[in-house]
Amino acid sequence: MGLSLAAYAGAALAEIAGCFAVWAWWRLGASALWLVPGALSLGTFAWLLALTPVEAAGRSYAVYGGVYVAASLLWLWAVEGVRPDRWDMGGAALVLAGAAVILWAPRG
């Protein structure tokens, strides 16, 4: 379980950082050199997501979706300086609950 959570959290950080690099170049006028670490971050994201111990890619992606929503709100607050509101937090709680059901449901 620890490796799974670490892989999902690392994947979220890598994807958000990679996407933000493109955002910074495209929307904020940052240098095109931002695209280099952005591409590396997105490659790291894919690699980390492949490490998750889930038997089907689609299920792994579904669980990751919940982690991504929560991590995006942390990024919003920590990096962009915008505090998430109660609707953001409520939505994140809902998707994390759904991700937990998908990840830990008994299958057999």
From Swiss-Prot:
Highest taxon of source: Bacteria
UniProt keyword terms in alphabetical order: Cell inner membrane, Cell membrane, Membrane, Transmembrane, Transmembrane helix
Membrane topology term: Multi-pass membrane protein
Any one Gene Ontology cellular component term annotated for this protein: plasma membrane
Tagged with keyword Transferase: no
Keyword Protein biosynthesis: no
Pfam families xref list: UPF0060
Compartments where found: Cell inner membrane
Membrane-crossing residue ranges in chain numbering: 5-25, 32-52, 62-82, 86-106
HAMAP family registered for this protein in UniProt: UPF0060
Family as reported in the entry's similarity comment: Belongs to the UPF0060 family.
Name the record gives this protein: UPF0060 membrane protein RHOS4_03690
Lineage summary: Bacteria, Pseudomonadati, Pseudomonadota, Alphaproteobacteria, Rhodobacterales
